[in-house]
């Protein structure tokens, strides 16, 4: 039984390690890479090199904060994809080496499944069925989750992810990277009625599109006679449009499924404006509960990877030594069971349980 799990996350620009003991978080270390800020976005080669340097120290610190020696680790869970290929490879190679050296179990985890499990790190009573909105720099996914390990894709973005749109609009407004926190801070001082931007596809099913909204902001920026005066209101108008679309789709999914719980996950879920609007509108619609993790668990982190890995390990699932990083690792869609990685040994999906609390 894998009671002590080391989680490793290196999919983008955070180097993270965490230790989970019997499902409880014992330690979490996240080292952010500040080197990218000057470029206004993540430089893949720099990210890979930074992970190479930082990961051994981050793992050592996570073990020390948990008060455990390496020999205490039963299993290693690592993000196998999707993400930046080089960055993922650093984590996967380290995890395989650590696991092999101690004859430990190894499990590859899908990054977005990690985000799905993030609220369960703090709320062990969280259990399906629920609707999940996972919003990050690379993904915008709306899922029907009838049980852990079973994910039905309701909708996703057709172009830019919501987090990507925030980063690009932040650049247009002369703000820093990452764009989401910068826009949210600036938007608090903006006039919500000054700029009204389109809500793309807001009336159309569960799909998303943010490219046209980004273009509308670009035109407004170019047309502004005083950008310094308008910057905060532009940020507010853009943020209001994105959040309105996200929450409207989430509301629609809750109604369609009849579920009483909605989960928010991913880096964009760090936004208090998003979680607040979702709680307000879903609460007004009959008391549906919104489950969202604390900001440090919504950002990329190893605790969520350890939690997802712990779930799969308790089902007897393992990855073999052919585990490899996949930048495009897919999250299976309608009626398909998400697997942690194609190298899982079991040829038949085991029965799923929902009571691992």
Regions found by a protein language model. Name each.
Residues 1-345, 349-357:
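Acidic, glycine-enriched active-site microenvironments
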């Amino acid at each position: 039984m894998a009671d002590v799990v080391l989680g490793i996350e290196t999919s983008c620009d955070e180097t993270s390690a965490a230790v989970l003991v019997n499902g409880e978080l014992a330690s979490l270390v996240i080292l952010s890479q500040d080197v990218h800020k000057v470029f206004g976005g993540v430089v893949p080669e720099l990210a890979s090199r930074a992970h190479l340097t930082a990961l051994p120290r981050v793992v050592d610190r996570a073990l020390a904060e948990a008060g455990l020696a390496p020999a205490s680790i039963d299993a290693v869970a690592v993000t196998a994809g999707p993400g930046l290929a080089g960055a993922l490879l650093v984590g996967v190679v380290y995890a395989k080496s650590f696991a092999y050296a101690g004859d430990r179990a190894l499990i590859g985890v899908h990054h977005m499944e990690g985000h799905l499990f993030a609220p369960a790190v703090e709320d062990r009573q969280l259990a399906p069925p629920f609707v999940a909105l996972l919003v990050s720099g690379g993904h915008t996914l709306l899922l029907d989750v009838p049980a852990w390990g079973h994910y039905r894709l309701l909708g996703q973005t057709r172009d830019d992810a919501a987090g990507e749109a925030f980063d690009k609009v932040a650049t247009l407004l002369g703000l820093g990277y990452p764009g989401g926190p910068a826009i949210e801070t600036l938007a608090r001082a903006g006039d919500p009625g000054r700029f009204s931007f389109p809500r793309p596809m807001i009336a159309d099913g569960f799909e998303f599109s943010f490219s046209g909204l980004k273009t509308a902001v670009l035109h407004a920026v170019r047309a502004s006679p005083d950008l310094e005066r308008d910057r905060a209101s532009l940020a507010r108008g853009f943020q209001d449009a994105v959040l309105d679309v996200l929450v409207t789709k989430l509301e629609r999914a809750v109604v369609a499924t009849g579920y009483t719980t909605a989960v928010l996950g991913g880096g964009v879920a760090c936004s208090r404006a998003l979680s607040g609007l979702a709680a307000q509108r879903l609460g007004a619609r009959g008391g549906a509960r919104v489950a969202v993790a604390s900001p440090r668990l919504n950002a990329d982190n190893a605790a969520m990877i350890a939690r997802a890995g712990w779930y799969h390990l308790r089902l007897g699932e393992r990855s073999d030594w052919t585990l490899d990083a996949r930048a495009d690792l897919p999250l299976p869609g309608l009626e398909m069971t998400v697997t942690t990685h194609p190298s899982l040994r079991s040829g038949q999906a085991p029965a799923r349980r929902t009571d691992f609390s």
